[in-house]
Amino acid sequence: MADKITSRSQDYSQWYIDLVRSAKLADYSDVRGCMVIRPNGYAIWEKMQAALDAMFKETGHVNAYFPLFIPESYIAKEAEHIEGFAPECAVVTHGGGEELAEKLYVRPTSETIIWASYKKWIQSYRDLPILINQWANVVRWEMRTRLFLRTTEFLWQEGHTAHATKEEASEEVLRMITIYKKFAEEYMALPVIMGRKTESEKFAGADETFCIEAMMQDGKALQAGTSHHLGQNFAKAFDCQFQTSAGELDFVWATSWGVSTRLIGALIMAHSDDRGLVLPPKLASRQVVVIPILRGDKTAVLEQADAIVCTLKKHGIPAFVDSSDQNSPGWKFAEYELQGIPLRIELGPRDLAGKKCVVARRDTLEKTELPLDDTFSMQVSEILNSIQQNLYDRALSFRNEKTVEVKSYEEFKTAVENGFVIAHWDGTDETESKIKEETKATIRVLPEEQEYLDRYTMMEPGVCIYSGRPAARKVVFAKAY
């Protein structure tokens, strides 16, 4: 129930943990740093998987699966890559009661094991492009964990593509980060900023990394997806060459891209409230709950409740009845608000007599009456669409309110405690590092979307807020998860 949840204003971090556990989304396990994703949480992941998988396949990608274990020699082939991941790796040293001749790394990401296969599969330009996605689990030995947001083991998808030219790889990188943006905004109702990472923040082993960044209700940023241009780095590490259409040998160009179950954490922190989970209808496996108010003629009310569910299902709206008598209607109202069911329908004897019902929205908690006539399903569908749009609009308005532009470092230090900060940066790793050390804020993204560039005149030259040196453009700073 909602009374188990600490309020956001009292302790935002505890609110998040309380909500995840009370809404039965996930729980701690007996394995340090690992979580149990409960059915309510996994249902959200399944909806995410289905939407993303369809988007991937629409753009020509196919699914495959590669081994969980990666030989140490493979990991060592790409020096920058292993340097970035070594501290987080879990390593298998024994198997079958014996010490292994070569250590096996439990995958932190799959570039190396996949490129070992690509080397065997690619000989000619006719073998390209390869557009493969993998749904899998990965392990990164995290020291400070938080349910969904940062765990030792998590679920994700990782795309790995191979191309004949740098330009084709660049197109793929932008195509996939655009798909992630579309998914975040259209399904998660989550406005995101799309752009490039700085050199120090890019993926280990990549030439460049593109990302989408979202704002949570505490003003912090959350990286919601990344797409990496790997250049020819992994192809060279695995000697993966192909014969071009001109008959020459060249190394293959590569990309990788991924999102994970941390998107569920983003969903929770972007939309939910002190009563519990708030879900966009497109990611709710159960969009409507019908709660009969059983007084007087119970049979007629139950029959009408079942009829409502049947009608809604025929129109593609996932609905169910809770007719159990163990708990009161009031208890059920609170419980389904906690679980984030987007729409509640209340039906009692008086409603039945008036050929109507009461509907309650989870996003605004507003109640209205709907006639039980031929327009009923259409009106429910319209309300669900309205909830989806309202959640996006509300999150966008919040982000805009919590985004400020500053001209001095003193202004910056105050502003970055509350949200996103737009400021000039001189482009040096030194300045970026010192700002992070002093404020714990990082450069989240160098925006590339025209709308965002125009809104904040991002490409306007100026003076770096920290060093006072000339700055070619503005960037987005924030504290982050």
Swiss-Prot record:
Belongs to the class-II aminoacyl-tRNA synthetase family. ProS type 3 subfamily. GO terms for molecular function: ATP binding; proline-tRNA ligase activity. This is Proline--tRNA ligase. InterPro entries: aa-tRNA-synt_IIb, aa-tRNA-synth_II, aa-tRNA-synth_II/BPL/LPL, Anticodon-bd, Anticodon-bd_dom_sf, Pro-tRNA-ligase_IIa, Pro-tRNA-ligase_IIa_arc-type, Pro-tRNA_ligase_II_C. Its EC number is 6.1.1.15. It comes from the Bacteria. It catalyses: tRNA(Pro) + L-proline + ATP = L-prolyl-tRNA(Pro) + AMP + diphosphate. Homodimer. Its main location: cytoplasm. GO terms for biological process: prolyl-tRNA aminoacylation. It is found in: Cytoplasm. It holds the Pfam family tRNA-synt_2b. It comes from Chlorobium limicola (strain DSM 245 / NBRC 103803 / 6330). Keywords: Aminoacyl-tRNA synthetase, ATP-binding, Cytoplasm, Ligase, Nucleotide-binding, Protein biosynthesis. Consists of three domains: the N-terminal catalytic domain, the anticodon-binding domain and the C-terminal extension. Catalyzes the attachment of proline to tRNA(Pro) in a two-step reaction: proline is first activated by ATP to form Pro-AMP and then transferred to the acceptor end of tRNA(Pro). GO terms for cellular component: aminoacyl-tRNA synthetase multienzyme complex; cytoplasm. Signal peptide: none annotated.
